[in-house]
Amino acid sequence: MFILLVLVTGVSAFTTPAVVHTGRVSESPVTSEKHPVLGDDCWFRGRDFKSELRLEGEPVVLRCPLVPHSDTSSSSRSLLTWSKSDSSQLIPGDEPRMWVKDDTLWVLPAVQQDSGTYICTFRNASHCEQMSLELKVFKNTEASFPLVSYLQISALSSTGLLVCPDLKEFISSRTDGKIQWYKGSILLDKGNKKFLSAGDPTRLLISNTSMGDAGYYRCVMTFTYEGKEYNITRNIELRVKGITTEPIPVIISPLETIPASLGSRLIVPCKVFLGTGTSSNTIVWWMANSTFISVAYPRGRVTEGLHHQYSENDENYVEVSLIFDPVTKEDLNTDFKCVATNPRSFQSLHTTVKEVSSTFSWGIALAPLSLIILVVGAIWIRRRCKRQAGKTYGLTKLPTDNQDFPSSPNQIKEMK
């Protein structure tokens, strides 16, 4: 019985529910180690590497960088609060221009006095963490455009791609988003063969990029809140570089099939190896049935993560994640493709989502059961062998009990 109890306990240990990985360690934006803030029970994780640079009079959304680490959306008992470093008062307080929505802090419209360090604090029953991020609000003039620009690079004589960044919170359907593109102060004509629509209004293709295409671009979106319209401007500095020796990108993940449970949240990273010791202009994105993700899923159930480039052991990588929130049956019949391209090469890798019907594995359960049967069988055979041995011993001893036969040669007498 003791053996059976141990083996049954082993079965329960083997059949723990499967865990779907929804995050990546390499995506952590924190470079400093955790250290406690003096006089507080919270762990301070440091400052986010990215500063928010915005224009006065426009909407601003600050996203708490702690959320990917703590997953506040998965716990109804978690508490996320905001404060400013120069004030002990929690936000929004009495400020009508500020409010908290899920894991984000909204400021609408922003003014220059909103510049500063903001701290988001995450608490639950077990722990408390803090992280800071910087907001800088500039005067909305052309002189400020270079200060708030996103740097994007295109190779000479290739098809360039401009991306209007950081609009996730403002676009519910990217196919319906109204975005206008400018080069300097000149509105780009949609019929211009030089600048092509990519099907997604947040992206603009540049045909046969030349040195003359370098410069400052603007994408302007109209956002309506409580009946009032606001402009959201993103400035881009495009640099055109001559063709250099580019590494051939190698897509090393994902796998051909990704196991997932229907209704669960799933993150599938596309990891691309870019060689060692060299910079790269490789662009990575996802497609669903040969369609951009933002177009295939206009409501945002499936989205792309940030373009994350990093180094490990002097090896360069870039990752872009495909985020399902949640996984549905539609995804099981969809051909997802990760694409990596640079002036030297074009690579793609297909993957599909496969439903995991149950976290219980009969194969794992039957293995200990088979072991139980073998142990019980071995015990039974051993006992049976003991009984057979006892009977044989009794039979071989019978002749020695007969006194008619002498037991020693000395007892034999000669008959006369």
From Swiss-Prot:
Transmembrane feature ranges: 356-381
Subcellular location: Membrane; Cell membrane; Secreted
Biased amino acid composition, Polar residues: 399-416
Single GO molecular function: interleukin-1 binding
Major subcellular site: membrane
Domain (Ig-like C2-type): residue spans on this chain: 29-136, 146-233, 249-357
PTM statement from Swiss-Prot or TrEMBL: A soluble form (sIL1R2) can also be produced by proteolytic cleavage at the cell surface (shedding) involving a metalloproteinase.
CC annotations in GO: cell surface; cytoplasm; extracellular region; plasma membrane
Region (Disordered) location: 396-416
Bilayer disposition of the protein: Single-pass type I membrane protein
Assigned keywords, A-Z: Cell membrane, Disulfide bond, Glycoprotein, Immunoglobulin domain, Membrane, Receptor, Repeat, Secreted, Signal, Transmembrane, Transmembrane helix
Signal peptide location: 1-13
One BP annotation, GO: cell surface receptor signaling pathway
Disulfide bond sites: 42-128, 64-120, 164-219, 270-338
Residues exposed to the Extracellular side: 14-355
Highest taxon above the source species: Eukaryota
Residues with glycosylation annotation: 124, 208, 231, 289
Cytoplasmic side: 382-416
Quaternary state and interactors: Associates with IL1RAP to form a non-signaling interleukin-1 receptor complex.
Function: Non-signaling receptor for IL1A, IL1B and IL1RN. Reduces IL1B activities. Serves as a decoy receptor by competitive binding to IL1B and preventing its binding to IL1R1. Also modulates cellular response through non-signaling association with IL1RAP after binding to IL1B. IL1R2 (membrane and secreted forms) preferentially binds IL1B and poorly IL1A and IL1RN. The secreted IL1R2 recruits secreted IL1RAP with high affinity; this complex formation may be the dominant mechanism for neutralization of IL1B by secreted/soluble receptors.
Family (UniProt): Belongs to the interleukin-1 receptor family.
Name of the protein described by the UniProt record: Interleukin-1 receptor type 2
Gene responsible for this protein: Il1r2
